[in-house]
Amino acid sequence: MSENALLALQRHFEDQFGHIEGLQPVSAKPSETAFNSDASEKEQSPTTSNEEEDAISDMEDKEDVSFGSKILRVSHQEVEKPTLSATVGRVSFLKKMPKLEDEEEILAKKREEQKLRKRSRQNDDGSDDDEVENLKNDLELQKLLRESHLLHEATSRTGQVQLVAEGKIRHKVVQQHIAQLGGKKETEKMPMAARRGMKKKQKHIEKVIENEARESGTVLAKKRKERKQFKKGFRPVTFSAPGKLVGGTLLLPKSMIPK
């Protein structure tokens, strides 16, 4: 209900039952004057009938019964919105801004970076030196393992422990190293008769082994056939063409020339 209706209801109630203590009057607004003027005009106008007045009074009685002696009032007050102070925004803006550094702070940071770089370089140099030394030790150990059988032979003869190859042993070590690198194996210096005897003995041993394997039924590895080597400039007799033709002249070996 509007305030004008409440004011009219309060007046009607006071006319019938009198004023009640503790009941606060309803404040009238400028629209109340218009309502009063309309009500006075309606009372003065002869068109209003008694039936309409009775109906209005019945409605007002019902409203009195429903509301009782309490009148509800609603006050509308404009609530001011809190405005943010400029200092809060300024502080948040300054927090987001990067911190300005002085020249002294910049120089201190540069010095710290230089110190860290020097330390890292020293550590790298130390690790490189260790790697070089370890590699050198590995090579020496490998060399000692390769020469161990020759050094053991020398120590067994002399009775003194030798870790460095000397004399004939050093020559053997060099030849062994050349053979490992893919070089041709040099034949040892000895008389031709002794060499032929060694080869003959080796062939005899191989034949004995083959005969024993054939009798026992064991299978040996297939032997590689050696090609016969001929001297340069001569051909074997099996070829159809005798000798060699060079520059229009026929060269014959001495074995083919009749005596």
Swiss-Prot record:
In this UniProt entry, the residues modified to Phosphoserine are: S127
Span list, region Disordered: 22-68, 111-133, 181-202
For bias type Acidic residues, the affected ranges are 50-63
Alphabetized InterPro entries for the sequence: FSAF1-like, Ribosomal_biogenesis_FAF1-like
Record has Translocase as a keyword: no
**Which GO terms are recorded in the biological process aspect for this UniProt protein?**
maturation of SSU-rRNA from tricistronic rRNA transcript (SSU-rRNA, 5.8S rRNA, LSU-rRNA)
Assigned keywords, A-Z: Phosphoprotein
Pfam families registered for this protein in UniProt: FSAF1
Q: Where is it found, in Gene Ontology cellular component terms? A: cytoplasm; nucleolus; nucleus
Protein name, UniProt field: Uncharacterized protein C3F10.08c
Could you tell me which species this protein originates from?
A: Schizosaccharomyces pombe (strain 972 / ATCC 24843)
What is this organism's lineage?
Answer: Eukaryota, Fungi, Dikarya, Ascomycota, Taphrinomycotina
